[in-house]
């Protein structure tokens, strides 16, 4: 059985790590490299960095901090933010990132996924999906440019349809960001994640809602995701990564200790 992964998420804005609630009201948490080092030392399996305003502001991730992170940590990390071309992706990988993630640019041009996969291989192409539950229509919809609330917009995609499309285009992994749950620490959206799991043939990472160790156990046991991403519980010291892994191991969930 493949080990389940614990993945701290670092949202980056103007060179600092920030965290919001439901993608709004972001506050500064700390500096990029020290936080990355801390999580690597604490036993994280992987890190994800999102430059949250890059796509909305029509720019790309600052490569300088990508290279600094690569010099200081020895676990895989993924970067996202404004990557629209093969050349931009190549640069980030050359500076030390193990994977690149694409979200809003893929919604604008879905064929970008196929071009990236052809160039670099599916194993390092991650698609981030910002999914919002619309109670009025009882449906999950994909939103775009969510890093800047003034730029956020609806798309025509139902989440499940977009999950199917990005797999057809050749993505290697999907991060499902459940916007309604983000930062509120009330648990992952097991219903939505289970639905997506049933149509997702690539590794699926749950994002949004972690508040307790039990929430991690639930998302692995009930939704059968491959990895669980979280931010505020790690940034605020609510959950220690090694303690979390010991807890999960005691619950018979395969993790790397």
Curated annotation (Swiss-Prot):
One of its GO terms (cellular component) is cytoplasm. The keyword Lyase applies. It is found in: Cytoplasm. Pfam families: His_biosynth. It comes from the Bacteria. Pathway: Amino-acid biosynthesis; L-histidine biosynthesis; L-histidine from 5-phospho-alpha-D-ribose 1-diphosphate: step 5/9. It catalyses: 5-[(5-phospho-1-deoxy-D-ribulos-1-ylimino)methylamino]-1-(5-phospho-beta-D-ribosyl)imidazole-4-carboxamide + L-glutamine = D-erythro-1-(imidazol-4-yl)glycerol 3-phosphate + 5-amino-1-(5-phospho-beta-D-ribosyl)imidazole-4-carboxamide + L-glutamate + H(+). Its EC number is 4.3.2.10. GO terms for biological process: L-histidine biosynthetic process. Keywords: Amino-acid biosynthesis, Cytoplasm, Histidine biosynthesis, Lyase. The active site is at 11, 130. GO terms for molecular function: imidazoleglycerol-phosphate synthase activity; lyase activity. Heterodimer of HisH and HisF. Belongs to the HisA/HisF family. NCBIfam families: hisF (TIGR00735). IGPS catalyzes the conversion of PRFAR and glutamine to IGP, AICAR and glutamate. The HisF subunit catalyzes the cyclization activity that produces IGP and AICAR from PRFAR using the ammonia provided by the HisH subunit. PANTHER family: IMIDAZOLE GLYCEROL PHOSPHATE SYNTHASE HISHF (PTHR21235:SF2), IMIDAZOLE GLYCEROL PHOSPHATE SYNTHASE SUBUNIT HISF/H IGP SYNTHASE SUBUNIT HISF/H (PTHR21235). This is Imidazole glycerol phosphate synthase subunit HisF. It comes from Shewanella pealeana (strain ATCC 700345 / ANG-SQ1). The gene is hisF.
């Amino acid at each position: 059985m493949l080990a389940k992964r614990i993945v701290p998420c670092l949202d980056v804005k103007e060179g600092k790590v920030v965290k919001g609630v439901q993608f709004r009201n972001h506050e500064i948490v700390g500096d990029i490299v020290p936080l990355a080092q801390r999580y690597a030392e604490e036993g994280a399996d992987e890190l994800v960095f999102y430059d949250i305003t890059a796509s909305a502001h029509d720019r790309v991730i600052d490569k300088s901090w990508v290279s600094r992170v690569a010099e200081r940590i020895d676990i895989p990390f993924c970067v996202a933010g404004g990557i629209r071309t093969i050349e931009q992706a190549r640069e980030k990988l050359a500076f030390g990132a193990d994977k690149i993630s694409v979200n809003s640019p893929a919604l604008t041009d879905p064929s970008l996924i196929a071009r990236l996969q052809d160039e670099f291989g599916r194993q390092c192409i991650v698609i981030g999906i910002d999914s919002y539950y619309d109670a009025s229509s009882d449906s999950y919809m994909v939103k775009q440019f969510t890093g800047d609330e003034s730029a956020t917009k609806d798309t025509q995609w139902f989440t499940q349809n977009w999950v199917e499309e990005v797999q057809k285009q050749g993505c290697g992994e999907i991060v499902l960001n459940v916007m309604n749950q983000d930062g509120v620490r009330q648990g992952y959206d097991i219903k939505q994640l289970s639905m997506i799991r049933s149509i997702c043939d690539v590794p699926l990472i749950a994002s949004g809602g972690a508040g307790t160790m039990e929430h991690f156990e639930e998302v692995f046991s009930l939704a059968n995701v491959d990895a669980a991403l979280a931010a505020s519980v790690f940034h605020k010291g609510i959950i220690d990564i090694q303690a979390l892994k010991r807890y999960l191991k005691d619950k018979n969930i395969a993790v790397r200790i």
